[in-house]
Every structure is written in structure tokens, then in C-alpha cells.
């Protein structure tokens, strides 16, 4: 990225597991955006007190699309890792409002404002044989389709598998058990095997940041770029350089 052309990145979902790693990566890497703008319900972590962070805190998520389109300077790239769970949201209908509707509205607002690139953390399986029967896959697929239809200079989708990392708490007992099983399995299988179905949040975050940077530098493989699990690992771990 040329230092003569400073860029700004807006991050939605900066307090979640993947989003918090995206934020820390953006703030600590010397080769990323000169300014990082966030929109969130609560203030994001900024342990280094970086002057590059410009947070907007508003608990009313219905205002976020307007807030996004009003950011100054206008971000070159928007990254959304926004998402919740059915348990946390209080049901599928409420989860749909966040995972689908709000992400769709944010993408539309970004396009209308003139944002060049949009990066979305989706999920593996959105195009699988059973995806039309799974509400979670339908949510993510709908957002992907919207981003593609908006025709950004670059639309970038990451489809990670099971996301590993230290959460504040498991959303339900079954989730905690699943993560424990995967962690235990990791002691017996190679990292390459684990990479086929689960990735660390930090790796996903780094892949998102690197993909955004490549788009801004004109190095993305195409204007519509979908990163499946193997490419996430490639960009976020194997080829990652601070």
C-alpha cells in the first residue's frame, strides 16, 4: 500500500471474536490503513491506545447504516464480521435481523456512499446441498448475494469453518462441548487435518485484512473473490507477514 495514498477502513463487528482480532491486526500492522473506524454497541478494545482508531458507539443498530455512510473520511474498505447466535439474539427471527438484514443494509449504505471494497465474514456451507434448508446458511447466503449484486470494485467473502479462539463465554453448553472436542482432537490429528474444518479466529482475521489490502493495491484475483477454508489458512497463516 502506498504511503502517499492513505486509506481508511471501517470495521463492523469489532467486539466479536473474529472482529476483535481484525481490529487488533489493523491497529498493529504498519502496512494497513492509516485510520480504522468502527461502529459498535460498546467500545472496542484498544490496548495500545492507538491514535488510528476512531470508534463510534451506538446501541441502536438501526442507525448503523446511516452512521456508516456518514463517516469522515469515507472508508476505502468496509469489513463486516457482524454476527450473533440464535441463543444470544433470542430466536431465529431476531438473529435474522442482525446476521442478514443489518449486514444487507450496511452493504447497501456502503455502496451508496461510494465505498470501493466490501469484505464479509460469512461461513462455510452457504452453497452446500442442504444450505437452503438451514436458516443460518440462508442468512449468510443472502448477504453474499447482496454484496455481489451491488458490484463493488471488490467484493470479498470469507467462508471459515468452525471458528476457534478464546470467547468471553460459550453461547450454550453444546457449543462449549463442541469447541472442547475440536481442541482435544487437535492433539491427535495434524494441523492440516484441522484446517479442513476449523480455523483460529486470528488466522481468519489476518486473511480478511490481507485480502482487503490486496484489493486496495489492485492485487486481488478478481473483483468478486471468495476465500474458502484453504485460502483463509494460506493468506492468514502460511503467507502472513506483519
Swiss-Prot record:
Q: Which CDD domains match?
A: CC3_like_SDR_a
For bias kind Polar residues, which ranges apply? 35-58
Q: Which organism is it from?
A: Neurospora crassa (strain ATCC 24698 / 74-OR23-1A / CBS 708.71 / DSM 1257 / FGSC 987)
Gene3D superfamilies to which the protein is assigned, alphabetical: NAD(P)-binding Rossmann-like Domain
Domain of life here? Answer: Eukaryota
Which InterPro entries does the record cross-reference, listed alphabetically?
Epimerase_deHydtase (IPR001509), NAD(P)-bd_dom_sf (IPR036291)
Where does the transit peptide lie? 1-87
What SUPFAM superfamilies does the entry give? NAD(P)-binding Rossmann-fold domains
Region annotated Disordered, chain positions = 33-58
Key words of the record: Membrane, Mitochondrion, Mitochondrion outer membrane, Transit peptide
Picking any one GO biological process from the record gives: import into nucleus
Pfam families for the chain: Epimerase
The Gene Ontology CC terms held by the record are: cytoplasm; mitochondrial outer membrane
Answer yes or no on keyword Mitochondrion.
yes
Gene this protein is translated from: fmp-52
Q: Where is the protein found, in the record's own terms?
A: Mitochondrion outer membrane
The record's comment on protein family reads: Belongs to the FMP52 family.
The protein's name:
Protein fmp-52, mitochondrial
Query: Does the keyword section mention Membrane?
Result: yes
Q: How is this protein positioned relative to the membrane?
A: Peripheral membrane protein
